[in-house]
């Protein structure tokens, strides 16, 4: 087992090395290939055509050859933006490779569209796309790059729009902590590629164009993606710079949308929208909730919050209720603020007694609320200062009344365990009010939001100190009275005799600490000032640097403290004994002053660390090391350690702290305005909220508002229906505004791109056009027998630019990029070392890991959708048709109001018992079904001559057959029987006469004739002269004209699904050859498609709902069976083949239909088949089906292709049908029979429903918390 494991590891390592070191094999270009690549580089279309016509298929020429830079002719055409050359190369079946990615990288839109259509036409289901199948050693792009990702990297709006309209999807990255099998395998196989693929995916998701096109709420998407990138930035610190850059891009996009808000209404809608269901739904004209701005503050979107438009809106809300305040002078503003501050008790009482009065409403204004709360807090700080200065005692001493002096003396005797004084009682009341306010804030915001604000942490710490002070004072009172009442001990004695940890001393320490934090809270209040605010932000940043510094400083302090304490503790004990030689509790400072001073320096680890800390400020001298009984070596070693500590701490660490603080201040000063506005906005938003209007300590008093809530008098709650309608209105209004902003943003970005000056690409394009024109003129002159000497010699000097010369030199001199031959041989012959670490990793990997709380495989399966890198043209057309359908529904929203009531009752008799309003509602909800029923009823009544019945779509998307009833079906059968009899007479005459118009060859020679016809386009041939006369038969109603490829045959009933719809009759001049003749210029494929579609555009019926294509038009109903076929009718299928590239010279047709049964041998049972055949069978084919066909589809036909074939079709066929077949029957077939026969169409892809995104059509796929809502397609 061990040997097998080791061999597997060696094989895996060997394959990985082979992959990593795999290089493209050196290939020496022939002279023809060199000329071919140079002609493509110069844009020489005639030269390229000539080489392709002369040498394609020979050993001297390979159309897929590459230049030394590993560029094929197709990539060269894309880089030079030569569309005609690209089309020619595609027509000659060049390998596409990663040309689509190159076109996207070059931002060549026309090439992208053409290559997307090529991929859709030639790609087989289950096979890799062309850029995925390319050799990784030769590819320019990594494996994880898809067209949509690359287009997002280029941030090209137009290409992204094309791909998203086609339904292309983006492979979503899994969560960074995902532990599914796919992520674990990818991480173990190649961790670098795994991380880079994640970076590429997030770089695509961060593209502004992709967010604008794919997200219904771009601002929310930008916020959430920025927060996730911040998390990735912390978890994958190796790629911190990349994630930081992407995060900055996303933040800039969200902020740039604010630049395009033109009115206050747009800005209010943008900032007040709440994407989560809530009871408070904002509408225009109501009090602003600013939910989106709160979300921006929560996600730390500082540039978004500090935007001038946002700040203007916040300032307008902040100074609401004080008109003209901002235009007053500073002295007048100060007077107004003082008046408001001094009157805060009056306003508070008004609000408590009458919450709905004018004074109470005025107090709810944000600025007034801020002034009242600030003045209340200032009064609390005044009380703290009065308690610290012992104002009561000083007042008693100044007044010096006898009773006051007596009271003061008694208080000093009973200071331990005394009750709080009047100022302390007021402070305790304030503390209770402040704690109550903090609890309300914690309840409303939640624990997470409360902790995120650092000033709430400061409030929590100060309140904890105050609570400790109150508890310690209560404990001291209990202890004192316990000793006094129960133990009979006098607890009152001077302070110097108290225990070191007496509760009174502990309470004073806690009160002092709480006082410090309370005064520091003023910094937060001063952040509203434009001068003090930036300083407060800088101070906060420096505190973070100090905390980082103290982590290292504490480590150094503890290390040297342990060392010095180990050296000097014994000698410190000797000094202590000298100090306390008289009494253990009394120090002899008179005789042993030095010993009493220095013994504490190194007595224990705590004292040693304190000494080293104060040594940083120069408060410890070297005399402290002259301890009693210390030895010279010990003193020297201690001094050496103290010196080392001083160098590391004072010179290195302290200067590093100064440098860090300077750097932080420099960073803050560069963006001081943004940081300050963000901090000020946080302060403003805290006063915009409802509640907390009354400042402390009045918030402890019950008010009328609270009493009404307690007694049950609440506002009437909104119903769910009302909430849902309000949410829909808010969502609709927000969508309209966001569409406007996104459209303005994209327009501005496109204009900014177009405003660039002349670039190098423009010069290259002009040079390419001039070069192509030169060679075209030379070709024209040569074809007209002009004397053009030395064309080849002159063409070699076309590339006069530096890049052109370098490229030509490399091609002509066979320059190759690769290993030096000797070095490559040495590397291949060197012995690979044994990989011990991989074996060790396999042994460790056998251990079972702890089972986590999350099943990552289940999460990945749940959040995974089928990937479609490029989508399809069908999806793009469906999107446009859905928009048209949606617009039509909106325009006809009230159509049911004018509908005839009688017709409604006839349509549904149950409507006679309901009111008119109910009938109108029924019409609105059932309009689609009523319209479909009307169309079906019209089809059942019968169509005009030559018009087949339309087949409705079933749930699976296939067309169901509708059998026409009544006498129309009998007439069709009689006409079909007469037509078969006439055709049989024609066949017998043709077989007897042996005219050139029929097949006079035996059946065995049929195959050879077919191959010959495939290689050479057939010439226009006239039908047999012995055909039926004009008066013999009438055409079958709805059957259409006879098929041009089989004038003497009738198709089997089951063959309608296997053949293309008959092409409409065209003029003789419209016939196009299947392939260009030598020396002629081939028409590009796109032009051929355009010409083909323009011919059939007029005959297309209107599209049905959902953008489903209509069936192919049939021939006119007045076409007669004996009419001669026009040459264009026979050539139309050939032109279609040449255009779509669906046939190749070396491919053979095969299928159950070969050889076809002649119509002349039809038995009476065939009449039953024709009866079952529907008039619209030939119209079921869509015009676009021929584009999707491939040559191999005929052999790969699935049983589902015959699902419309009825069970009785095979039973009606008699056993003697094949036996009665005559040799002359096969003679009647023309060579064009097999030529015109086309393979079955590929299965259609599922259509996207109305309102459904392309990602939702394929199912949801693996995505993280944020990026799962990205590709939801709403434009």
UniProtKB/Swiss-Prot annotation:
Signal peptide: none
Record-annotated membrane-spanning stretches: 367-387, 419-439, 451-471, 542-562, 610-630, 638-658
Species name: Drosophila melanogaster
Gene from which this protein is expressed: trp
Protein name as annotated: Transient receptor potential protein
SMART domains: ANK, TRP_2
Topological region Cytoplasmic: 1-366, 440-450, 563-609, 659-1275
Keywords per UniProt: ANK repeat, Calcium, Calcium channel, Calcium transport, Calmodulin-binding, Cell membrane, Cell projection, Ion channel, Ion transport, Membrane, Olfaction, Repeat, Sensory transduction, Transmembrane, Transmembrane helix, Transport, Vision
Modification after translation: Phosphorylated by inaC.
């Amino acid at each position: 087992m061990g040997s097998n494991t080791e061999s597997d590891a060696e094989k895996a390592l060997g394959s990985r090395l082979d992959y990593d070191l795999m290089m493209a094999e050196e290939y020496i270009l022939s002279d023809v290939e060199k000329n071919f690549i140079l002609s493509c580089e110069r844009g020489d279309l005639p030269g390229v055509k000539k080489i392709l016509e002369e040498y394609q298929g020979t050993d001297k020429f390979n159309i897929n050859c590459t230049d030394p830079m590993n560029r094929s002719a197709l990539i060269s055409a894309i880089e030079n933006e030569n569309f005609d050359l690209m089309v020619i190369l595609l027509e000659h079946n060049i390998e596409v490779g990663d040309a689509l990615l190159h076109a996207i990288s070059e931002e060549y839109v026309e090439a992208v569209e053409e290559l997307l259509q090529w991929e859709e036409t030639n790609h087989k289901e289950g096979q890799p796309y062309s850029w995925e199948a390319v050799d990784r050693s030769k590819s320019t792009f990594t494996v994880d790059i898809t067209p949509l990702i690359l287009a997002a990297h280029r941030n090209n709006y137009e290409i992204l729009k094309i791909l998203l309209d086609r339904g292309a999807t983006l492979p979503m990255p899994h969560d960074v902590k995902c532990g599914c099998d796919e992520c674990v395998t990818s991480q173990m196989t190649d961790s670098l590629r795994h991380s880079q693929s994640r970076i590429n995916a997030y770089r695509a998701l961060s593209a502004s164009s992709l967010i604008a096109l794919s997200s219904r709420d771009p601002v929310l998407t930008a916020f959430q993606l920025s927060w996730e990138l911040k998390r990735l930035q912390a978890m994958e610190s190796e790629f911190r710079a990349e994630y930081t850059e992407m995060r900055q891009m996303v933040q800039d996009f969200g902020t740039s949308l604010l630049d395009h808000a033109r009115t206050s209404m747009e800005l209010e809608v943008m900032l007040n929208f709440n994407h989560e269901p809530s009871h408070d739904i904002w509408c225009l004209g109501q009090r602003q909730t600013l939910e989106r701005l709160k979300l921006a503050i929560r996600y730390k979107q500082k540039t978004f919050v500090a935007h001038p438009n946002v700040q203007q809106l916040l300032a307008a809300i902040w100074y609401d209720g004080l008109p003209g305040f901002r235009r007053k002078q500073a002295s007048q503003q100060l007077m107004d603020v003082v008046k408001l501050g001094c009157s805060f008790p009056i306003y508070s009482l008004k609000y408590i007694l009458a919450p709905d009065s004018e004074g109470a409403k005025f107090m709810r204004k944000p600025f007034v609320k801020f002034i009242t709360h600030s003045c209340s807090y200032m009064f609390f700080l005044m009380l703290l200062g009065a308690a610290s200065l012992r104002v009561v005692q000083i007042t008693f001493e100044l007044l010096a009344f006898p009773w006051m002096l007596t009271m003061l003396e008694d208080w000093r005797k009973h200071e331990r365990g005394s009750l709080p004084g009047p100022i302390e009682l007021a402070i305790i009341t304030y503390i209770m009010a402040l704690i109550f306010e903090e609890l309300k804030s914690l309840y409303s915001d939640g624990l997470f939001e409360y902790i995120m604000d650092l000033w709430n942490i400061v409030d929590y710490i100060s309140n904890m100190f105050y609570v400790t002070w109150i508890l310690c004072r209560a404990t001291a009172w209990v202890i004192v009275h316990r000793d006094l009442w129960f133990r009979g001990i006098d607890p009152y004695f001077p302070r110097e005799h108290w225990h070191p940890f007496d509760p009174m001393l502990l309470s004073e320490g806690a009160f002092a600490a709480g006082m410090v934090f309370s005064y520091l809270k003023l910094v937060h209040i001063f952040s509203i000032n434009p001068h003090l605010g930036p300083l407060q932000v800088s101070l906060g940043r420096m505190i973070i640097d100090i905390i980082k510094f103290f982590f290292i400083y504490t480590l150094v302090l503890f290390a040297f403290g342990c060392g010095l304490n180990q050296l000097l503790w014994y000698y410190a004990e000797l000094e202590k004994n000298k100090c306390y030689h008289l009494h253990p509790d009394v120090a002899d400072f008179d005789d042993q002053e030095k010993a009493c001073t220095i013994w504490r320096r190194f007595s224990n680890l705590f004292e040693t660390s304190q000494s080293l800390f104060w040594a940083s400020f120069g408060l410890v001298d070297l005399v402290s090391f002259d301890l009693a009984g210390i030895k010279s070596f010990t003193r020297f070693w201690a001094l050496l350690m103290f010196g080392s500590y001083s160098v590391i701490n004072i010179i290195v660490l302290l200067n590093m702290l100064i440098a860090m603080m300077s750097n932080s201040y420099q960073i803050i000063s560069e963006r001081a305005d943004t940081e300050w506005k963000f901090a000020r906005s946080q302060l403003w938003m805290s006063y915009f909220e409802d509640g907390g209007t009354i400042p402390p300590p009045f918030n402890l008093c019950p008010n009328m508002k609270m009493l009404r809530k307690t007694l049950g008098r609440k506002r009437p709650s909104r119903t769910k229906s009302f909430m849902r309608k309000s949410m829909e209105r808010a969502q609709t209004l927000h969508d309209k505004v966001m569409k406007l902003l996104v459209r303005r943003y994209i327009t501005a970005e496109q204009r900014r791109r177009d405003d660039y000056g002349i670039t190098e690409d423009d010069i290259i394009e002009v040079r390419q056009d001039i070069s192509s024109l030169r060679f075209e003129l030379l070709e024209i002159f040569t074809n007209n027998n002009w004397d053009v000497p030395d064309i080849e010699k002159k063409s070699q000097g076309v590339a006069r630019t530096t890049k052109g010369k370098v490229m030509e030199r490399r091609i002509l001199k066979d320059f190759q990029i690769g290993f030096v031959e000797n070095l490559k041989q040495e590397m291949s012959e060197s012995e690979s070392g044994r990989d011990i670490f991989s074996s060790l990793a396999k042994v460790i990997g056998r251990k079972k890991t702890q089972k986590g709380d999350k099943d990552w495989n289940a999460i990945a399966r749940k959040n995974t959708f089928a990937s479609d890198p490029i989508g399809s043209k069908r999806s793009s057309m469906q999107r446009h048709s859905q928009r048209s359908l949606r617009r039509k529904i909106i325009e006809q929203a009230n159509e049911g109001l004018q509908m005839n009531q009688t017709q409604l009752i006839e349509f549904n008799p149950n409507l006679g018992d309901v009111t008119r309003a109910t009938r109108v509602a029924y019409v609105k909800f059932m309009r689609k079904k009523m319209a479909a029923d009307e169309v079906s009823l019209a089809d059942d009544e019968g169509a005009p001559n030559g018009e087949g019945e339309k087949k409705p779509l079933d749930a699976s998307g296939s067309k169901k057959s509708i059998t026409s009833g009544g006498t129309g079906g009998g007439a069709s059968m009689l006409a079909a029987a007469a037509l078969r009899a006439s055709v049989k007479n024609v066949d017998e005459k043709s077989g007897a006469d042996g005219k050139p118009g029929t097949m006079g060859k035996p059946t065995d020679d049929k195959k050879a004739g077919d191959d010959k016809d495939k290689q050479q386009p057939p010439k226009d041939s006239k039908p047999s002269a012995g055909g039926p006369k004009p008066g013999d038969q009438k055409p079958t109603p709805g059957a259409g004209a006879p098929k041009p490829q089989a004038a003497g045959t009738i198709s089997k009933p089951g063959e309608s699904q296997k053949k293309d719809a008959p092409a409409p009759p065209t003029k003789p001049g419209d016939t196009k050859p299947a392939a260009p003749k030598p020396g002629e210029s081939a028409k590009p494929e796109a032009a051929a498609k355009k010409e083909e579609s323009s011919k059939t555009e007029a005959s297309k019926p209107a599209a049905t709902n959902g953008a489903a294509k209509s069936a192919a038009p049939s021939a006119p109903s007045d076409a007669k069976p004996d009419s001669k076929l026009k040459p264009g009718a026979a050539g139309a299928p050939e032109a279609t083949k040449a255009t779509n590239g669906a046939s190749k010279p070396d491919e053979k047709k095969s299928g159950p239909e070969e050889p076809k049964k002649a119509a002349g041998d039809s038995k009476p049972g065939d009449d039953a088949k024709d009866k079952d055949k529907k008039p619209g069978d030939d119209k079921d084919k869509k015009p676009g089906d021929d584009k999707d066909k491939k040559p191999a589809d005929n052999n790969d036909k699935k049983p589902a292709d015959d699902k419309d074939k009825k069970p009785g079709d095979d039973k009606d066929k008699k056993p003697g049908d094949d036996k009665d077949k005559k040799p002359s029957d096969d003679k009647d077939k023309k060579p064009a029979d097999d030529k015109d026969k086309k393979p079955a169409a590929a299965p259609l892809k599922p259509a996207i429903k109305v309102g459904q995104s392309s990602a939702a059509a394929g199912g949801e796929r693996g995505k993280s918390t944020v990026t799962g809502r990205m590709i939801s397609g709403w434009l």
